[in-house]
Swiss-Prot record:
Signal peptide: none annotated. Residues 24-180 form the UBC core domain. PROSITE patterns: UBC_1, UBC_2. Keywords: ATP-binding, Cytoplasm, Developmental protein, Nucleotide-binding, Transferase, Ubl conjugation pathway. Accepts the ubiquitin-like protein NEDD8 from the uba-3-ula-1 E1 complex and catalyzes its covalent attachment to other proteins. Plays a role in male tail tip morphogenesis. This is NEDD8-conjugating enzyme ubc-12. Disruption phenotype: Worms either arrest during embryonic development, or show vulval eversion at the L4 stage and burst at the vulva during the L4-to-adult molt. Those who survive to the adult stage display severe abnormalities in the structure of alae. RNAi-mediated knockdown results in severe male tail tip defects. Its EC number is 2.3.2.34. The lineage of its organism: Eukaryota, Metazoa, Ecdysozoa, Nematoda, Chromadorea. One of its GO terms (molecular function) is NEDD8 conjugating enzyme activity.
Length: 180
């Protein structure tokens, strides 16, 4: 009998669902990595670099974002992107590996970014039509488009940004010199 929860967890009668999902994910990733390679070459400014540490694990990627302007200029922010078997039905899992003072990135590296949410309250959440290029652009924009922190993950950073911009900028520069 068909059991939805078992199916979601990757279990079914013949045990092949998870294998099929991994095959689909890897095929999508191969296509998307080619698109990202082209996008990387076409950059006017080198704002990001993507690496696949192991060719046998296409689903584990490392992204380095290097802002060229703004308060995060000069920093090198590393992210680990893990693409689950259920991709593209669920978003990749992204963790910031570089300690950074940012309203949307907390001290343990968790990230608040609509595109990374399965169930987002706005229209920018994850959908199967999204891809890794969208994720990369979203992560790059975290360091360029400081706009709205009503949904901040690092509350202290958001409050400092809105109440004392000079102190916020100083703390950002301090973190960049210490951790980047």
């Amino acid at each position: 009998m068909f059991n939805l929860q078992k199916r979601i967890n990757g279990n079914n009668e013949d045990g092949r669902y998870l294998e099929t999902r991994i095959a689909v994910r890897d095929k999508l990733l191969a296509q998307e990595l080619q698109q990202l390679e082209t996008a990387l070459r076409d950059q006017k400014q080198k704002l990001w670099h993507l690496e696949v540490p192991s060719t046998s694990c296409l689903h584990e990627l490392e992204l380095t974002v290097t802002p060229q302007e703004g308060i995060y200029r000069g920093g090198k922010f590393r992210f680990k992107i893990t693409v689950p078997p259920e991709y593209n039905n669920v978003p990749p899992v992204v963790k910031c590996l570089t300690k950074v003072w940012h309203p949307n990135i907390n001290e343990d590296g968790s990230i608040c970014l609509s595109i990374l949410r399965q169930n987002s309250l706005d229209q920018y959440g994850w959908r199967p039509t999204r891809n890794l290029t969208d994720v990369v652009h979203g992560l790059v924009s975290l360091f360029n488009d400081l706009m709205d922190f009503n949904d901040a993950l690092n509350i202290q950073a958001a409050q400092m940004w809105s109440q004392n911009r000079e102190s916020f900028n100083h703390r950002v520069r301090e973190y960049i010199s210490r951790y980047c």
